[in-house]
Regions:
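Bacterial N-terminal signal peptides that target proteins for export
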Residues: 2-14
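Intrinsically disordered/low-complexity terminal segments and short unstructured peptides
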Residues: 4-6, 22-23, 92
Length: 116
């Protein structure tokens, strides 16, 4: 077998799974007009309004200010009094207000009606 055949075969073996992953992800996360991906983390494909996406980014930026200095009973990501984990996905420990956490849950619940 020639080096060229091996190289082409190797490229195909690498490229095919990548193409499949990209097209599958896009198909699963196609937002209706007027909605965008929330992007509260990489691969967060919940469809929300642009204002809601901006809010999630602001929460991410401000979250460290709402963590209990030195940690607490829930570890280093324990929130200060009056704040809770956002829980937009399993493991989301960004500290937000209880109202903001409920908004994230509402966004998750509405996602099906915001996707194509």
């Amino acid at each position: 077998m020639s080096n060229q055949s091996i190289t082409i075969g190797s490229l195909f073996a690498i490229a095919l799974p990548l193409v499949f992953a990209v097209t599958t992800g896009a198909a699963l996360a196609d937002c209706k007009s007027g909605f965008v991906w929330r992007e509260a983390r990489p691969n967060d494909f919940v469809c929300v309004t642009p204002a809601q996406r901006s809010e999630a980014k602001a929460q991410n930026a401000n979250g460290p200010n709402n963590v209990q200095p030195g940690g607490g009973p829930y570890g280093p990501t324990t929130c200060r009094q009056g704040y809770v984990w956002r829980e937009a996905w399993d493991g989301d420990t960004v500290c937000v207000t209880p109202t903001e956490r409920q908004e994230a849950k509402n966004e998750n619940a509405a996602n099906a009606s915001h996707t194509n």
